[in-house]
Amino acid sequence: MEKRKNLFMVSLVLSLVIFGLFVLSKRGGNGSLKREFDGLEVSPTYSSYYLQKKDIFETTETSYVDKIFVGDSITDHGEFHEFFPDQVILNRGISKDTSAGVLNRIHEVVGRNAKEVYLLIGVNDIRTKVEQAVYIDNIRKIIDTFANSKSEIYIQSILPVNNSIYGNKVTNDKVILFNTALKQTAKELNVHFLDLFPSFIDQNGQLKKEYTLDGIHLNGKGYKAWTDLVSGTHTTSK
């Protein structure tokens, strides 16, 4: 009797295994099943680098800040504290960031109560074909977040690119259109507009080669030119 019971259990298990294999074969095998499970996973909106940097920013407790630079890789790569050695400087650049990414993390910047905040964002919005209206709406929301802050806000124009080096993923015609909208937005929101663009273009309307290696990011001379313009912001008006 016991032997028959054992045989029945073995037979039942084998039947279930065979049935399972049959179902998998009809649905495309293990790979298909894995793809179905993978399809249920929510794709991350932000890169691991973005999330890591955001977490680090939010963990630090620096106060009495003079200047905060906010932006994408062009900001991220800058050693701004070396250009302003007598001031407390924070770099809040994250490589590949967009206006939406900055909006998602801007509360940490607001909470620092810095004397001055310099925002440079937009080239990745252009590169990833974000509509200008969406971009400007994000900029408005970023600035609105500072409504109760005493920080002086500087919206900086998007820098030109050098298409002969970088290619045509971003055109300067598009940059100019975005910058025109940025300038108007800064005026409407009563914040400073720091127009970097004219100081960085050559006679052909391209990012000066002496300021870049890859056609979009800045080298040492480029950062020196940028920070020199920032140093003169006390003379700019809203």
Where are these regions (language model features)?
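N-terminal secretory targeting modules
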Residues: 1-66, 235
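Conserved SGNH/GDSL esterase-like catalytic core that processes O-acyl groups on lipids
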Residues: 35-141
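Active-site flanking residues adjacent to catalytic metal/cofactor-binding acidic residues
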Residues: 70-72, 156, 194
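Short, structured coil segments at secondary-structure junctions
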Residues: 85-87, 149, 189
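A short helix->loop->beta-strand "cap" motif at the edges of active sites that frequently abuts
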Residues: 115, 148-152, 191
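Alpha/beta-hydrolase-fold catalytic nucleophile elbow
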Residues: 120, 156-157
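Alpha-helical scaffolding segments of alpha/beta enzyme cores, especially the outer helices
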Residues: 137, 141-148, 177-184
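Catalytic His-Asp segment of secreted/periplasmic serine-dependent ester chemistry enzymes
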Residues: 160-238
